[in-house]
């Protein structure tokens, strides 16, 4: 699973996901990309599931870039514990994804394979996404 090697503080506040993504909104490395259309926390497990789905379709051809990294810890209190007594333990890591952010990029495969792979990866995420190409940044909704 993806997670930071070290962090300055173990726990973070939740924060808010307002507005659109500031950076990472264009396909910079590959030919095809998967773009988020809504804000969400994407967990390390969801990123890994998407990566596996893409690699399963592409087999051993092509190259994949993961453009998001889960650097925010999220906490959870144990089941059946009363409120209070401090913040819960770190349960996992998430990446804060805002609308417009490119999540995955792929290259080295034909158009049909790229679209099929990104469609499978899109099904692993809790948000609507669209497939975009380097030339056509408008894309098609998935």
Curated annotation (Swiss-Prot):
One Gene Ontology MF term: structural constituent of ribosome
CDD domains registered for this protein in UniProt: Ribosomal_L16_L10e
Gene Ontology biological-process entries: translation
Keywords: Ribonucleoprotein, Ribosomal protein, RNA-binding, rRNA-binding, tRNA-binding
Subunit record text: Part of the 50S ribosomal subunit.
Protein family (similarity comment): Belongs to the universal ribosomal protein uL16 family.
Protein name: Large ribosomal subunit protein uL16
Gene: rplP
């Amino acid at each position: 699973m993806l997670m930071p090697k070290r962090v300055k503080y173990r726990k973070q506040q939740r924060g808010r996901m307002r507005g659109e993504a500031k950076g990472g909104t264009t396909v910079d490395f590959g030919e095809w990309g998967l773009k988020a259309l809504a804000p969400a926390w994407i967990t390390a497990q969801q990123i890994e599931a998407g990566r596996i789905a893409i690699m399963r379709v592409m087999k051993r051809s092509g190259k994949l870039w993961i453009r998001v990294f889960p650097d925010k810890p999220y906490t959870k209190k144990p089941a059946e514990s009363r409120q209070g007594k401090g913040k819960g333990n770190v349960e996992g890591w998430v990446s804060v994804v805002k609308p417009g952010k490119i999540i995955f990029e792929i290259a080295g495969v034909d158009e049909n394979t790229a679209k099929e792979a990104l469609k499978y990866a899109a099904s692993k995420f809790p948000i609507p996404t669209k497939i975009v190409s380097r030339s056509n940044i408008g894309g098609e909704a998935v």
